[in-house]
Amino acid sequence: MSVTAAQVKELRELSGAGMMDCKAALAETNGDMDAAVDWLRKKGIAKADKKAGRTAAEGLIGVVSKDSHAVLVEINSETDFVARNDGFQDIVRNVATAALDTPGDVESVSVSLYPGSEKTVELTIKDAIGTIGENMTFRRSAKLSVENGVVATYIHNSVSDGLGKLGVLVAIETTGNKEAALAFGRQVAMHIAATNPLALTAQDVDAGAVEREKAIFSDQARQSGKPENIIEKMVEGRMRKFFEEVVLLSQAFVMNPDMTVEAALKDAEKSIGAPAKITGFIRFALGEGVEKEETDFAAEVAAAVKG
């Protein structure tokens, strides 16, 4: 029998399955909608590998901290609906927990045991793809530690404890009051969430990025027709402004724009009761760098039926 676009659309809405799966199910069951739903359900985990080709750009950032260590993980899903699912949220939280006992990179976390299970993180996520019905990607993971001090954390737009769309870790080295250091660290983490600095210090900025900016500023300055010595000063001024915008310690502190982050850190040493130093930070924003697929639903249905 021939399968209509209306049937494919209805089955997709009932099952949440993909277009081609819905078309195959209807063909196998002679258009019986209930039987087609059952046919898809029986596929179960077997659908997981097929889903692995679909773009997963939604999902959640998870953060877990313990003592002087903290981790960020990003697990993507195809839709925000699944990201709000309790089961998906548990997976993100547990993967972050597992990451604490590893070096923190995706490879080491993936082969570690999933909390409360004899399966690895990688296998648990693959099983969940079939159960939840969407492609899921363990995209990235990072760990930040400090020998003496604290690692402050911040989740922006939190949907649950330790879960949200943007996460930040900040390591502060100090022998002073940890609660005061954590409080200031959280403020810095919020600042980083808002400003997205490229590096901690000017020396840490990628050399290629610096040269690229310098070349752009030089070309712009030469268009003014001014002498070369004036152009050099113009470029120096613009590069100074560039570093003020992208270097964490040089940025105007969001909580008090009258001082830089470095000056705010010096001021915070009064409440911390000892010298303090920011030794590193990590910022994950959900889906950054992932190109989301924009699908014409009507065209997708038509293509599936014709295909």
From Swiss-Prot:
Role noted for this protein: Associates with the EF-Tu.GDP complex and induces the exchange of GDP to GTP. It remains bound to the aminoacyl-tRNA.EF-Tu.GTP complex up to the GTP hydrolysis stage on the ribosome.
Example GO molecular function: translation elongation factor activity
Region (Involved in Mg(2+) ion dislocation from EF-Tu): 79-82
Keywords attached to this entry: Cytoplasm, Elongation factor, Protein biosynthesis
Family in the record: Belongs to the EF-Ts family.
Protein name according to UniProt: Elongation factor Ts
Primary localization: cytoplasm
GO terms under cellular component: cytoplasm
Location within or outside the cell: Cytoplasm
